[in-house]
Regions:
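Terminal helix-turn-helix DNA-binding modules in bacterial transcription factors
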Residues: 218-259, 279-288
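Short, Lys/Arg-enriched, Trp-marked, Pro/Gly-tolerant hinge/linker segments that flank
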Residues: 120, 142-151, 160-205, 218, ...
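Residues within helix-turn-helix
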Residues: 199, 210, 246-249, 259-260, ...
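Generic protein-terminus/edge-of-domain signal
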Residues: 1-59
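Short hydrophobic/aromatic patch on the recognition helix
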Residues: 61, 212-213, 261-262, 266
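A secondary-structure capping/hinge motif
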Residues: 216-223, 265-279
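Amphipathic alpha-helical segments enriched in hydrophobic/aromatic residues interleaved with Lys/Arg
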Residues: 105-157, 161, 186
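Ligand-binding loop in jelly-roll beta-barrel domains
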Residues: 70-93, 99-100
């Protein structure tokens, strides 16, 4: 999914219906890995949205946040859904603000379900952003700093309203993690493709493997080894679904010298062979 925000902005607001009109047939149901943030905020109707191979419901009061680097796919039944979309670049928000910190959390929740008490304020925030964006397109001159700043603040309000809603833990996020577990998680994000052993992470963090294991099990009920294997398998699945790379270069890029060892690992982690997983993703993209 490609996105270039209209100059001079790093944000775009549209409806799902408008996106469907712009996209060629079959484009939206194919796996995409955007380098920008995508918020999908349901207005009425029901549909599902796939993010990193999990389906999330979208309806009135439900929102989905796709973060840069995640693989996402629109469902074939999204014509039943009316929704607002907000697309924005990772560096658009004001640094040092709460909204920017929320957006920068790559482990943040995917789905949000707003209660009646918070839905009104969320609806107001997204309506105001939509109107502000339309006004900016009509009236702003290239390089208009005031309009850009206004859109940054309107988007910040929307994010704060959205994240005030409870986020189910079932989406696999570990939002708000700190301490040793949080530092391990960040280091894992940096090194998972080159370091598969727990000892590497414990050494870099300055702790014993046992101490690191206690920290992760307390935080998320997983061992460091389980977290390492899950992260490698997720990246492999993303590349198999979205890229055209053959299995061998994917394996090499993830630190496997032997493609057969990678295939064994992926099958053990996911229950399906890499080539079969790729075929399934391609077939699901073309199903009506």
């Amino acid at each position: 999914m490609r996105y270039v925000a209209p100059a001079p902005y790093g944000v775009e607001a549209m409806t799902l219906a408008q996106l469907r009109e712009m996209a060629p047939p079959g484009y939206l149901t194919a796996p995409q890995r955007p380098a920008f943030h995508l918020l999908i905020l349901g207005s009425c109707g029901q549909a599902t949205h796939t993010v990193d191979f999990r389906e999330y419901p979208i309806g009135r009061g439900c929102g989905v946040w796709v973060r840069p680097g995640q693989v996402q796919r629109f469902s074939s039944d999204d014509e039943k859904l009316s929704a607002d979309l907000v697309l924005f670049q990772p560096d658009f928000l004001i640094p040092g603000t709460e909204a920017a910190a929320i957006a920068d959390d790559r482990f943040g929740p995917v789905n949000y379900d707003c209660s009646h008490s918070t839905r009104y304020h969320l609806d107001q925030a997204r309506s105001t952003l939509r109107e502000g964006y339309a006004e900016a397109l009509q009236t702003a001159r290239p390089g208009d700093a005031m309009q850009t700043e206004m859109l940054r603040h309107l988007l910040s309000v929307l994010i704060l309203r959205l994240t005030a809603a409870p986020a189910p833990r079932t989406n696999g996020s570990h939002h708000g993690a700190d301490g040793l577990h949080g530092r391990f998680r960040d280091l894992l994000e940096r090194d998972f493709a080159v370091a598969h052993d727990v000892e590497h992470y414990a050494r870099v963090l300055g702790y014993s493997s046992r101490t690191l294991s206690r920290a992760t099990q307390t935080a998320v009920d997983q061992t460091p080894k389980q977290m390492i294997q899950e992260r490698i398998a997720l990246e492999a699945a993303r590349l198999l679904a979205h890229s055209s790379l053959a299995v061998a270069p994917i394996a090499a890029g993830l630190g496997f010298r032997d493609p057969s060892n990678f295939s064994t690992f992926f099958t053990r982690q996911t229950g399906i062979a890499p080539t079969k997983f790729r075929r399934q993703q391609q077939q699901s993209a073309t199903e009506p």
